Amino acid sequence: EENDDKEEKEDKAIRKDDGMEYIGDLLVGYSYADEWANPNAFLKDWRVGCPDGGKNNGPQLWNIAVLNPKTLFNEDGSLGTSGKLLKNKIERTLDGVENIRVDNVMGLVDPYIYKSSAVQEDGSISYNDRNFLSYTGIDPQHNYPKIFHKILIPTLKEHHINPQNVVFEDLGAQSPTFQEVFYGGKVDGKVYEDEKMQGIMYSKGNKMEGIKGPRYSFLSTHDNEPTATLLEEGSWIYNNEGWNPMYLAGYLMPPYNKENAKKSAEFCKDIEDNPRTRLKAKYAELFRGTPNIQVSFADLFGIDKTYNIGGQSNKDNWKLKLNSNYEDTYHKSLETEDKPAMNMPELLEIAVNSKVGMSIAKHEKTESEAKAETADLTERLEHWKDVLKEPEPDTFQDYEDD
């Protein structure tokens, strides 16, 4: 364990020099061993689930223990048994990483819970035995909503992590209590002005131009279909404003003069005719819309298979993996464009040039000034996008899915 700690610190030092950050997963759940070792930290009978996606159109029953609200904090405000357990869990997750993704943040504010003893043989459960914790009456002191601002946020700051940079995943169903705490920064009437979160922008069908607020955006995750499947003939993207060729071309290649107007028109036609170009443009638009984007491994490698069908018990869930020759496969995909793998330098170059073009179109800078500011960056991006397309040894294999 001592060697592991030393290695983690050395890895962090190397990444710091390279400007690279790792994001660890903070899973809001506990093991049976945690329950056995800390009986007072958890509620009896109650378990964490999800309001939708279960059997017979009911909730998902995850069988995850629920922290006891009564032992989160002592009377003097210090951490109680379950509060200490949670803080230690967050601390362990932060060891060796520079940021975290909270899965799911609802579980740290207002989890959806159910009585395990009330679950029927067919998996169904009465509405009276399941709800968001805030509606059950088992937390009269409102301790659970305090977790976010009194345990999670302070712990992040102790590790020099800006809460606004954390990736938060919700369940797609947000309770009023959650919205007050997360977006309003409210706990028992007090407003934490500097800790209001902005969340993630699920941008699959949205325009990113002029978007304000979200720190992260994404097209797909491990819980839904990869973007490669969106390119199929008849897909909804071909009739969606967020994927409209004229919008994407105008936003990414502003026609600020005759020469650029011609290039923008050609780009627009390519987006219209070529599904791969349309996806490439949509990815570049994400880089223009928010400071950060979230990318699933399936999208990065252009895989058209779904990693996990969210809300379903599927025998193939979580089994998709890369082949042992994935680096060659990736380079081959970029070289031949037979799979919509993401060429990051190329996408960033489009986004940077878009920003340059927009500043010129708005008369914020002259063309020579705007291009001079990014000349070094665009030159390097131009170089590396081509390097990634260079031929690799002929060892191409399909992605494995079992």
Can you say where each PLM-predicted feature lies in the sequence?
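Long, low-complexity, intrinsically disordered segments
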Residues: P393-D402
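Conserved, well-ordered alpha-helix/loop/beta-strand core segments that scaffold catalytic motifs
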Residues: E8-L27
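Intrinsic-disorder/low-complexity coil detector
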Residues: N38, G213, N274, K339, ...
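Alpha-amylase-like alpha-glycosidases and glucanotransferases acting on alpha-linked glucans and related
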Residues: E1-K9, G29-Q294, A298-F301, S313-N314, ...
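Structured C-terminal cap/extension of enzyme domains
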Residues: G302-E379, W384-E390
